[in-house]
Amino acid sequence: MIFTRLTRFVGHGTGLRLYATAEKSSLATLRKKTGYTFANCKKALEMHNNDLAKAEQWLQEQAQAMGWSKATKLEGRNTTQGLIGIMVKNNIGAMVEVNCETDFVARNQSFQKFVQAASTACVRYMDQIEGDANLTKVGLNSESLKQIKLEDGKSLADHLALMIGTVGENASLNRAICFKAPESINLTGYVHPAPTEEVPLDVPQFGKYGSILAFKHTSADSNGEVAKKVCQHVVGMKPAKIGDKTRDEPAKDKDDETCLIYQEYLADPSYTVAEVLEANNVEVVDFQRFECGEKIKMDDETVRAVN
């Protein structure tokens, strides 16, 4: 009889330990997956009988509601800092500006991940737009950007509110420019500061400055290296337009030059950009430059409504 009681006691204790271990494992998994606090993850699991899927859904719903509440309270506070995000995938390129209040938040991982998500969402949006034989260029203002959907079906506005709730600071989707190129035209992009390690352009990158260049080239620049350097030049030298030799005259003072083709080439000032392009059989079709915090509104004529 004593043996029977002892067996029952040991068996019951083992069961408790196994349950406690499973509970800790679920808690660790949920914490790692969502990034939410230990207390909130524990509460979610307790409310849903240790069901991970239901607990995660509840946490996301709570975070979304808190994010919208936080975003509403912080709305109107100046957002002069932030990042420029760029992604170029095959024949589609997107550049987006996301702003926040401080440079501290701009370095926050949650904010940076949102910038990457916004860049990816713009590429997906542009992929759904029918292109033609010419370069298609679409500008998106703040309201249009907010409507764009991510893969999870939620809008960028929803994800923005969620991010605001996480970082505790106001943030805003400012603008984006998207390109869709036919086979005859190539795209490249550049952000500054550039990543410390080389990253493929189809992986979203971010920095304080960015540019996208649409170009045509021949075998002389088969890997697009010259075009990449010109894209970097656009960030550094801030040209206002490509320029046309039949209509535009070089500026009297080289420091005042705003035509890309007449500017001294950033990588080698002994040449002009036009000379470098001609020597390598590269033709610039279009370009766009963003600087974080610059006071430039998206031209309404380029804005296309998001369906």
UniProtKB/Swiss-Prot annotation:
Subcellular location: Mitochondrion
InterPro entries the record matches: EF-Ts_dimer_sf, Transl_elong_EFTs/EF1B, Transl_elong_EFTs/EF1B_dimer, Transl_elong_Ts_CS, UBA-like_sf
A cellular component annotation (GO) from this entry: mitochondrion
Source organism superkingdom: Eukaryota
Family matches, as PROSITE patterns: EF_TS_2 (PS01127)
A single MF term (Gene Ontology): translation elongation factor activity
PANTHER family registered for this protein in UniProt: ELONGATION FACTOR TS, ELONGATION FACTOR TS, MITOCHONDRIAL
Name by which UniProt lists this protein: Elongation factor Ts, mitochondrial
Lineage: Eukaryota, Metazoa, Ecdysozoa, Arthropoda, Hexapoda
